[in-house]
């Protein structure tokens, strides 16, 4: 069992030997010197374009004046002593032939063994078991140095221990003297030969391995019942050599070639490890690297001592040694404490592991939380989300409370109430009185949008302006009110849902409830009847424009003027869209430009009104037939409908104009009533022709936006075939046009057009491939030939189906669009037409907005 990993780098040291007698006789001086404890410098002149540096830095640099004891203490002792802590260790000696590798390793091995035994003597509380083994790699054959048998040994792969040497002798050490005897045997068994550069040159790689196993002598508790086991390797590598320098031949030449081959593999492994563990590491190309695999880049602490000759004749070999050292110092190893658990401790550990796995099986959700840190992170995210929700709710509460306080302040102002009472007292007895806050029923208050009112908004003018002036005043008033709400509301309030259309039954029921109010006493005045009629109507409409729902007290029979005023108010309520729970879409402000008439008397207003409490009810548009019917049926009572605008809501100012005209027309001749149906029909005809022109223009713009935004082919086909010009399609056409325009503009502004275009083109290619496959199943041979001729595809060409699929929906001409839609609808099972499908499909086009401040600007402009 291994403990926690300790990533660290290989400790690299460089040792310079002095110039020997043979080199001194040739007159070779020293080209290298130690500039400091960690820096080695080249003495000679370095060319300007040299491929090698002039100085090198390592963990430690030793000059020829430093002894082996100093080399061991400062470069290898810490690594060697880590074996007593249960960490594997390896010490290498690398360099060219005759550079002093064996001389260095003999001293380091003796010093390490001596320190290990000194440590054992100082810690009698623990029991140590030391085992020793030795091997050499001669001509790529592994031999046991503790055995007289020269038979090569095989290398085996163990899943737990890694690469092991089969039948390798392992001696249990009795004492330090026993160890020295075994070291002498190894020295005698090792292959040594004479060359031109060295009289006693090592011809093989020697590996001395000591395994240290320690455990407590007394049972100190269940937590201290484990055993530490680790090994330390002392590796004396054979030196690299050149045949021209060593003057080797025959057996020496063969030995040199094997040595150089194994050292070349070692250099490749070190170089690959220094770059990271991404590529293939050729451990198995040499037996040396295969045996020392864990020591080079695995579970071990490693120290490499590079020995080199300072003589000028060995300058190239010295640079190669330093290059190897540069790569070695970048290698990272993962040293671990090797712990062997006792049987009792192992059983307990396995029991805990079984309990943990059973708990994960019982509670799968807890399996993902593998640590306390992950649990805390999840809790922090949950707390953060709850805090954000709480903050939003508090902001909504404060906004509603502020609006409610303003409403109460306005409603409780005695001067305003008295002023309104005096104004209503001048009106006709037949005009219903608009009651104050106390007259609102519980059912009516559900649809009230509390608005911030000022004294100027509640003030009533003393003169009645013309209808054109009323239109201008109302437009300015609506613009100011929307701008004020856009500033006071948070951005999140703009992202509310559009309310859908409910049934006529619900609207008629609400209109009936509107008039079912308790009777109360009204203040009447018989004088100045016609003047008070205009002022009272103006007061009623101004209060209703502020989103207060009035209730009427009827004490006297209703006159014709009062009935007209009621119809005006009820028409405004009935035309509003109530909220539906069945369909939801993202909030988008739809303009009523498609329903605008050319009449200059019709005031412009917003289709959607913002509310800090909830979205305002959307006004329902009236079709030309409905306008004609209402004009025909109510010709005697409603003579101002010929100038009414086909908008999504019945305009409030239109009601004022209607009431005023009603009052004036009471004293006029009744001969003009017979012309009303004819005028209404003319208005409907003009509006219908204008609608078709707007529809064709809007449809062409949408087709071009489809082409620019690379919209799905199936989406284009469904939309084109579903919405063919009916006036009820106006809202869907406007939503689609705004959605595409917003996507195009926002992507260009954000700088994401390139990536999004690539994704859209890829999706279009997949759709065309789908159509290409559908042609085999949906089209007959004769039909395909007819389509090829129709689309201009030569019958002698290849892949005609693929050509046809690539030409669909590639142009914006209406003829091309119709043919493409018809073909796609035939290849793809088209949805059945129907009102429900049209509405649900149209509402699904709305684009989900991002909650950012850029949306506020979009809403404010609409």
From Swiss-Prot:
Keywords: ATP-binding, Coiled coil, Microtubule, Motor protein, Nucleotide-binding
GO biological process: microtubule-based movement
Coiled-coil residue spans: 340-415
SS bonds (residue pairs): none
InterPro entries: Kinesin-like_fam, Kinesin_motor_dom, Kinesin_motor_dom_sf, NACK_C, P-loop_NTPase
Basic and acidic residues bias spans: 475-499, 518-531, 613-629
Name of the protein described by the UniProt record: Kinesin-like protein KIN-7J
């Amino acid at each position: 069992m291994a403990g926690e990993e300790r990533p660290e780098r290989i400790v690299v040291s460089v040792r310079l030997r002095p110039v020997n007698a043979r080199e001194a006789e040739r007159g070779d001086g020293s080209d290298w010197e130690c500039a400091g404890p960690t820096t080695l410098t080249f003495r000679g002149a370095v060319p300007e374009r040299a491929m090698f540096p002039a100085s090198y830095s390592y963990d430690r640099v030793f000059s020829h004046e430093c002894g082996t004891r100093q080399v061991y203490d400062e470069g290898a002792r810490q690594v060697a002593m880590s074996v007593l802590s249960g960490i594997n260790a390896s010490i290498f000696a690398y360099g060219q032939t005759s550079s002093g590798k064996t001389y260095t390793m003999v001293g380091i091995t003796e010093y390490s063994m001596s320190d290990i035994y000194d440590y054992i003597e100082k810690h009698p509380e623990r029991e140590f078991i030391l085992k020793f083994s030795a091997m050499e790699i001669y001509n790529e054959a592994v031999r046991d140095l503790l055995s007289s048998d020269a038979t090569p040994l095989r290398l085996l792969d163990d899943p737990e221990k890694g690469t092991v040497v089969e039948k390798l002798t392992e001696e249990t050490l009795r004492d330090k003297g026993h160890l020295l005897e075994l070291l002498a045997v190894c020295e005698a068994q090792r292959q040594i030969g004479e060359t031109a550069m060295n009289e006693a040159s090592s011809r093989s790689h020697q590996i001395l391995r000591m395994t240290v196993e320690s455990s407590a002598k007394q049972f100190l508790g269940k937590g201290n019942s484990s055993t530490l086991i680790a090994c330390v390797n002392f590796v004396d590598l054979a030196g690299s050599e050149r045949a021209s320098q060593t003057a080797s031949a025959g057996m020496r030449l063969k030995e040199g070639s094997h040595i150089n081959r194994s050292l070349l593999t070692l250099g490749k492994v070190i170089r690959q490890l220094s770059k990271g563990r991404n590529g293939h590491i050729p451990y198995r190309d040499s037996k040396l690297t295969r045996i020392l695999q864990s020591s080079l880049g695995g579970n071990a602490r490693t120290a490499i001592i590079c020995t080199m000759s300072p003589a000028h004749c060995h300058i190239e070999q010295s640079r190669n040694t330093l290059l190897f050292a540069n790569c070695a110092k970048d290698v990272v190893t993962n040293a671990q404490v090797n712990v062997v658990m006792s049987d009792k401790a192992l059983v307990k550990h396995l029991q805990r592991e079984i309990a943990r796995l059973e708990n994960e099986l019982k509670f799968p959700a807890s399996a993902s939380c593998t640590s306390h840190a992950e649990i805390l992170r999840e809790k922090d995210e949950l707390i953060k989300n709850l805090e954000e929700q709480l903050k939003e709710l508090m902001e909504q509460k404060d906004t509603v409370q502020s609006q409610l306080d303003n409403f109460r302040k306005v409603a409780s102002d005695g001067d305003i109430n008295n002023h309104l009472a005096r104004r209503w007292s001048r009106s006709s007895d037949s005009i219903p009185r608009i009651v104050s806050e106390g007259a609102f029923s519980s059912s009516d208050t559900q649809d009230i949008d509390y608005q911030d009112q000022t004294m100027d908004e509640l003030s009533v003018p003393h003169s009645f302006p013309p209808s054109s002036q009323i239109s201008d005043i109302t437009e300015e008033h609506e613009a100011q009110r929307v701008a004020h709400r856009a500033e006071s509301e948070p951005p999140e309030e703009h992202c509310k849902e559009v309310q859908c259309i409910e049934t006529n039954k619900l609207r008629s029921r609400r209109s009936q409830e509107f008039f079912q109010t308790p009777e109360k006493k009204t203040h009447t005045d018989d004088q100045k009847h016609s003047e008070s009629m205009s002022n009272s109507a103006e007061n009623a409409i101004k209060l209703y424009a502020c989103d207060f729902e009035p209730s009427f007290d009827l004490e006297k029979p209703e006159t014709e003027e009062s009935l007209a005023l009621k119809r005006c108010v009820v028409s405004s309520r009935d035309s509003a869209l109530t909220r539906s729970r069945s369909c939801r879409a993202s909030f988008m402000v739809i303009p009523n430009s498609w329903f605008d008439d050319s009449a200059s008397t019709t005031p412009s207003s917003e289709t959607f009104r913002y509310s800090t409490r909830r979205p305002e009810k959307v006004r329902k548009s009236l079709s030309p037939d409905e306008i004609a019917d209402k004009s025909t049926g109510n010709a005697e009572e409603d003579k101002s409908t010929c100038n009414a605008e086909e908008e999504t809501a019945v305009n409030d100012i239109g009601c004022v104009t209607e009431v005023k005209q009603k009052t004036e027309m009471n004293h006029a001749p009744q001969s003009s009533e017979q012309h009303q149906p004819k005028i209404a029909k003319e208005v409907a005809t003009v509006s219908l022709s204008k609608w078709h022109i707007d529809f064709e223009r809007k449809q062409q713009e949408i087709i071009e936006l489809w082409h620019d935004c690379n919209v799905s082919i199936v989406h284009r086909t469904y939309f084109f075939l579903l919405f063919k010009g009916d006036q009820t399609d106006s809202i869907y056409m406007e939503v689609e046009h705004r959605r595409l325009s917003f996507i195009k503009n926002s992507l260009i502004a954000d700088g994401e057009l390139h990536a999004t275009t690539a994704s859209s083109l890829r999706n279009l290619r997949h759709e065309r491939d789908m159509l290409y496959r559908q042609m085999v199943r949906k089209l007959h041979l004769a039909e395909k030939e007819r389509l090829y001729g129709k689309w201009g595809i030569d019958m002698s060409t290849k892949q005609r189906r693929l050509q046809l699929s690539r030409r669909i929906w590639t142009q914006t001409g209406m003829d091309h669009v119709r043919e493409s839609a018809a073909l796609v609808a035939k290849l793809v099972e088209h949805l059945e037409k129907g009102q429900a499908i049209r509405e649900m499909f149209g509402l699904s086009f709305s684009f989900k907005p991002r909650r950012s401040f850029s949306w506020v600007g979009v809403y404010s402009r609409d």
